[in-house]
Amino acid sequence: KDNAGKKGKGGTRYQNSQFYFRNGFCWTDVNTTYIKSRLKENGVYDVLSMSLFSLSHKIPDWYIVCLLNSKYISEYIDNFINSTQHFQINDAIVPIKIPTEKELKEFNEIFSRATELKKQEFKNEKNKGEIYEELDKLQDKLDSKVYSLYEITK
């Protein structure tokens, strides 16, 4: 770490290497009010696509992706944590509610279907209009599940 802070001097230094090549989830730094998160395969990460990693095997990364992709969590972050268009690592103080096994299964079904639809979109296997229509319905279902999970009435 002799080169830390010395611009133009020394070699490259590695940061947070304990997180290299781990699966996690990420989002783009600049967002609208509604955050869109996704799973991230093994790799090395940078600030353009912020990444987090679950510390508990009881809470799968895809579940946190579901929560972050919900309107409730986006609005919670916008109203109580950070009202800018940047959702950053330090903003990750979102209350994560532990789901029951039944709830976890329901979230997994939504996540799996949305993932399959996005794969079909990228492979041009299905009409994009049909895909977006089904994704909109899944978003509504996800939002309803998250509101119910947090015991919020609209």
Regions found by a protein language model. Give the residues of each.
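Polybasic, glycine- and aromatic-enriched phosphate-binding surface used to engage nucleic acids
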Residues: K1-K105
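Non-catalytic DNA-recognition/assembly elements of restriction-modification systems
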Residues: K97-K154
